[in-house]
Regions:
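Phosphate-group recognition and catalysis centered on beta-loop-alpha active-site segments
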Residues: 1-265
Length: 265
């Protein structure tokens, strides 16, 4: 089985490839997910959207334009059309012919490779419909041990938990709540994903003490260097939190960088 959500208490660390190894491969494709695992990741973060015919595809944007040779909203096209699109050539011509995967495709891959998936729901207008279909797919493929469900919308996460208590939920935060533990407990949240520029060791300590897993989202190393140029060297703090088992996961686009950090902690 993949690493548990609360990896730190087992002396482990989840290395999560954000949209797969998206620094070097076309994001949210099986190619990028496998590349992440090959580079040392044990988890991949993926994003879900609904097609016009209520099928779940793995894509980040509401529109097709940035990552495929298609155009328009994902919600305005049927699955058959989206599966015909090229999801690799815009990133690099070497990856021409890469396709947009479905949720089912990705779950089957995760089970075959024993890789954990951080599944982010990206469908604010049809969130309830997405949740229902997502849970049905997870039940059909018996994939509960391989996933946690994440979102910026913590009310949606509470609904996921109410409908399927076996699912673990991970709240994404871009702010710092006054009482982060109370806020997460109110939604029955199992884990929290925190941005580096809002990350404080004291919050991680409080969350771990409360039994809530902590995922730290890291920028690309060249962006992290901008903190250093501004007089803030954050690497010792990150390494210290990993070493002291205050962080269960590191997530980012550059799996090589995440691995380097984890090995130097």
């Amino acid at each position: 089985l993949p690493l548990p959500l609360h990896a730190a208490r087992h002396g482990s660390l989840r290395i999560a490839a954000h949209r797969g190894f998206s620094r070097r491969f076309p994001e949210n494709t099986i190619l990028a997910f496998q590349a992440g695992v090959n580079a040392g990741a044990n988890e991949c973060e993926i994003d879900l959207m609904l097609t016009r015919d209520d099928q779940i595809v793995v894509i980040h944007d509401r529109t097709l334009d940035r990552t495929t040779n298609g155009s328009g909203f994902v919600a305005d096209h049927d699955l058959q059309h989206i599966l015909s699109l090229d999801a690799g050539a815009k990133f690099d011509a070497r990856f021409a012919g890469t396709r947009v995967p479905t949720l089912a495709d990705t779950l089957l891959w995760a089970k075959q490779t024993d890789t954990r998936l951080a599944i982010e729901m990206k469908e604010p207008e049809r969130a309830d419909r997405l949740i229902d279909i997502m849970i049905a797919t997870l039940r059909e493929l018996d994939a509960f041990d391989h996933v946690a469900i994440s979102s910026f919308d913590h009310i949606d996460l509470r609904r996921v938990k109410e409908l399927e208590p076996r699912l673990q939920t991970e709240a994404i935060l871009h702010h710092r709540p006054v009482n982060i533990v109370a806020s997460m407990r109110a939604g029955g949240i199992d884990g929290v994903s925190l941005e580096l520029n809002r990350f404080h060791r004291t919050d991680a300590e409080a969350l771990q003490q409360a039994g809530i897993a902590v995922r730290l989202s890291l920028p690309l190393p060249e962006k992290l260097a901008m903190f250093w140029q501004g007089g803030r060297d954050l690497l010792p703090m990150i390494r210290g939190c990993v070493r002291d088992r205050l962080v269960d996961a590191l997530i980012g686009d550059d799996v090589d960088f995440l691995r380097m950090l984890s090995m130097s902690a």
